[in-house]
Design a protein with these regions (language model features):
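Gly-Asp-aromatic-enriched flexible segments
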Residues: 89, 631-661, 667-671, 677-682, ...
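Signature aromatic-anchored transmembrane alpha helix within multi-pass, membrane-resident enzymes
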Residues: 115-123, 288, 326-330, 457, ...
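Multi-pass, polyprenyl lipid-linked donor-dependent membrane glycosyltransferases
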Residues: 141, 206-211, 235-265, 270, ...
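Membrane-lumen/periplasm interface segments of specific transmembrane helices
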Residues: 310-400
């Protein structure tokens, strides 16, 4: 074959852009009318549309009727298992489609020469990234929350974030789990990776680079097929891979990199399966991919329309196909939908701006374009870029988009792509409706990542089409020129701005990143059993440190404080960072919080020693205090602990040489006196005095300084005749404020009534209704009820017990510092409903059902 013939065959094989003639010159309106006529819609399609709408309406009604409390509980209890089932379905989809892929793969792949070009591009990107971009967090609170979620999925198989916890021998014991309005996909990926590598932040930071490389390969394969030109696909891939924001995030732990990876996988899969060869087997892979895609960012569910439109002819063939597809996608995407219900009406900013509005849309649109066109540099950092956007790329994008719109409107070109693209952009509109969708908030400039693949596609296609149309040059030559221009621009700009990458452009202004890196190195030298009090405890957990929030630490009783002093060997540290100074700016669009008041209160309430201060590095003093003791409380009481009961024994520990005398009682019966002379002593309880159900040991100890310390130790002996209410599943609940808490108050503190702590029970809030289905055979319900001591301003509340809809007991009106014991007969009752009813108002009515349990006589 001659060289000319070979080149001609390459042109025919490599390009699929039609000549400008005939149908191409139809008006846009005429093209749409012809398309609708070609569908030959009839009664079956009307049925299909009706059923599809019904499925969507049913899903919306379920979503709209989910209570916030129920949605949040479901998120924690079932979030992990939901995405795990989607992962299993994904594996099944891959296995089922292996024969189809093996049969058609060779015809799908572009030429070996084009793969060599892609390989060179990937090598350049990789060398540049590892040489110029540090591997670190860039959006600290979000990235560490996914890491903490991954830890919780790995250790506990639940769907929330471990907000507070303790590391013991490499295992995280989560003390407080909270919801996360972010998606679960990245956390789940971490939970898988933690099976093979250390479960910590350093492992998490290694995950995104492979996603980055895989996304560029998938993007190239998809566009090679759709463009019919591997050169044009390589141009778009160069634009995508060289975007500064993408390069930076690929060396972080951001979910947007996984988002792009999954999107490009979907693009490649859709390009691989022609519309005339699609079967149900292909959707067995498509649906779980969409499920994972939806759980990268919750707004992604608004981008699903084009994934159905692409195969519209397949769906039109059978009336059940589209409704089945919609129902399946809703099922695998439900965790994201549930998150929207869980945070419905949640005011993230707490300021003067509406969470979602058209004002936000216009403000964000204007400010984002201005930011992406920003030429400003920072002379104090050697003239580096202040924003991770190339102005050149933004100009190309704007011009290319306008050109393609003109081509569509005037010449009727790219209509199908426009329709698919505009539906895909629904998620972008949702983001920009949000108050924090503006790039004036530096860390939110990463939101542009959801649109980067589309931007790269438009840039390459717009340049190619404008060049080919205006010069009438051969399409192969036009594609080659665009490829060369894209590669030269991308690689040249990367090299020119290498100092900006090395100085972590944009993110160098985020003081919290420097604070995190400093603490990660500094705290590594502290004792392994140290406990840190910090505004972002989940971040500490991801670094492998035990941590609690300032608010939780404030709520520690002397007994609890002594317990943690014992466990930590006296190594409790308060870390005061950026969050510990100033007040929240209510006029700002930035999501923020401050713990200044809590820290000041802790420093006033505890004796402490300042062990580290750095006042220069961050623009504010970063201080670490070692907590010594509580002020105004016996030093001996803070160094005396009593263990929980285990096998009929309780261990008493003291961290001082003097002897102390204690008397103790068991279930309100005095048992005797103890003289403690050793550092630790073991007390064996009288087994005859221990009863089925609830037990309480009470220790009253005289300290060397004449102070008296009282410590309660509750334990429950479960049997077929005694069961804790908190061990039963709560079938449903409604609560006017907060969520019911198991063995904690509604604000996550120890249940405390009239100064008396309780180990077991349910913390609630008026007005509330907690419903249980009871096992058969139980005759009595026991509880101690009242308003928790954490709520001192309530005007009283009633505690009501209902059985099978009938009122069985009602407490008197209980005020703060009051409690009442309830012993209610429930023989034959199947449905138990516990209500807390407010007095004149519900403010501060934190109602506790302490020591609630069932007994069979």
């Amino acid at each position: 074959m001659s060289r000319r013939e070979n080149k001609s065959s390459v042109v025919k094989k490599d390009l699929s852009v039609k000549k400008e003639s005939g149908a191409e010159k139809k008006s846009l309106a005429q093209s749409l009318r012809d398309w609708v006529s070609s569908l030959m819609l009839g009664k079956p399609h009307a049925v299909m549309a009706a059923v599809s709408v019904a499925v969507l309406l049913a899903a919306f009604l379920i979503f709209n009727n989910l209570t916030v409390s129920y949605a949040r509980r479901w998120d924690i209890d079932w979030g992990y298992y939901s995405i795990l089932s989607t992962f299993v379905l994904l594996i099944a989809g891959i296995i089922v489609n292996i024969p189809f892929v093996a049969k058609h793969l060779k015809g799908f792949l572009p030429s070996g020469k084009s793969f060599c070009g892609l390989a060179l591009l990937l090598i350049f990107f990789s060398v540049f990234m590892f040489g110029n971009i540090s591997n670190t967090h860039r959006v600290l609170s979000d990235e560490t929350s996914w890491e903490s979620m991954g830890l919780q999925m790995y250790f506990q198989h639940t769907g929330g974030i471990c907000n507070e916890g303790v590391w013991t021998d490499g295992v995280l014991d989560c003390k407080t789990e909270v919801n996360n309005f972010k998606g679960k996909a990245l956390g789940f990926v971490y939970s898988l990776v933690f099976n093979f590598m250390e479960p910590d932040r350093d492992t998490a930071l290694l995950v995104n680079y492979p996603f980055y490389i895989l996304s560029l390969i998938a993007f190239f394969l998809a566009l090679s097929k759709w463009f019919g030109s591997s050169k044009l696909a390589l141009a778009a891939t160069a634009f995508l891979g060289g975007m500064p924001i993408y390069l930076l995030q690929a060396r972080s732990a951001s979910t947007e990199v996984l988002y792009i990876c999954l999107l490009t996988f979907l693009m490649a899969w859709y390009a691989f399966v022609p519309t005339n060869k699609v079967t149900w087997k292909h959707f067995l892979l498509t649906v779980p991919l969409l499920g994972f895609f939806a759980q990268t960012r919750q707004e992604t569910v608004f981008a699903f329309v084009p994934f159905a439109l692409y195969y519209y002819r397949y769906f039109l063939e059978k009336p059940y196909r589209l409704p089945a597809f919609i129902a399946s996608v809703i099922a695998v995407s439900w965790p994201s939908v549930n998150n929207m219900a869980a945070y419905r009406g949640y005011d993230f900013q707490g300021g003067e701006h509406a969470a979602h509005s058209f004002d936000n849309l216009w403000f964000n649109l204007k400010t984002n374009i201005v930011t992406m066109l920003n030429f400003d540099t920072d002379p104090s950092f050697g003239g580096i870029m202040t924003n991770p956007f190339y102005t050149t790329f933004t100009i190309i994008l704007l011009v290319a988009t306008v050109w393609l719109l003109v081509r569509m409107i005037v010449f009727g070109r790219y209509v199908r792509g426009f329709i698919l693209g505009i539906f895909f952009c629904l998620q972008i509109f949702v983001i920009m409706f949000n108050v924090s969708g503006t790039f004036t908030i530096d860390i939110n400039q990463r939101y542009v990542l959801v649109a980067l693949p589309m931007f790269a596609l438009l840039m390459a296609l717009g340049l190619y089409d404008a060049l080919e149309f205006s010069t009438k040059m051969r399409k192969y030559a036009a594609a080659s020129i665009v490829m060369g221009l894209a590669c030269v621009l991308t690689l040249g700009l990367m090299l020119y701005h290498a100092p900006s990458y090395r100085n972590n452009m944009l993110y160098y202004k985020n003081k919290l990143l420097g604070e995190e890196e400093f603490l990660n190195n500094e705290l590594a030298s502290y004792p392994a059993n140290s406990v840190f009090i910090y505004s972002r405890p989940w971040q500490m957990l991801a670094q492998g440190h035990s941590a609690f929030s300032e608010r939780t630490f404030e709520g520690w009783s002397t007994d609890v404080f002594a317990e943690w002093m014992q466990k930590s060997g006296g190594n409790i540290y308060l870390v005061r960072g950026q969050d510990g100074y100033g007040k929240v700016n209510r006029e700002s669009r930035v999501v923020g919080f401050k713990t200044t008041d809590q820290i000041d209160k802790i420093l006033d309430s505890y004796k402490h020693e300042r062990v580290l201060v750095d006042a220069k590095k961050f623009g504010y003093p970063l201080v670490i205090y070692k907590i010594i003791s509580k002020k105004g409380v016996s030093h001996y009481a803070q160094n005396f602990t009593v263990s929980e009961q285990m096998d009929g024994m309780i261990v008493l520990n003291k961290r001082f040489p003097e002897s102390i005398a204690c008397d103790y009682s068991l279930n309100d019966e005095k048992q005797g006196d103890i003289l403690l002379t050793l550092e630790a002593d073991t007390l064996r309880l009288d087994s005859l005095k221990i009863r089925n159900g609830m037990n309480r040991a009470l220790f009253t100890c005289s300290m060397p300084d004449a102070d008296t310390t009282i410590i309660y130790r509750d334990f429950f002996l479960e049997s077929d005749r005694a069961v804790l209410l908190s061990a039963l599943k709560m079938e449903r609940y409604a609560q006017d404020w907060g969520d019911p808490q198991v063995n904690q108050s509604v604000e996550h503190h120890r249940l405390t009534l009239d100064g008396e702590p309780f180990r077991y029970g349910i913390g609630s809030h008026a007005n509330s209704s907690l419903e249980y289905t009871l096992p058969r055979g139980f005759d009595m319900f026991h509880a101690v009820v009242g308003l928790d001591d954490e709520s001192a301003c309530g005007d009283g509340a009633y505690f009501v017990v209902l059985g099978d809809g009938r009122e069985l007991a009602r407490s008197k009106k209980l005020y703060s510092m009051e409690k009442q014991k309830l012993d209610v007969e429930i023989t034959g009752v199947r449905h138990l409903n516990l209500k807390v009813e407010m007095g004149d108002n519900k403010d501060c009515d934190h109602g506790d059902w302490a020591h609630s349990w069932l007994e069979a006589r």
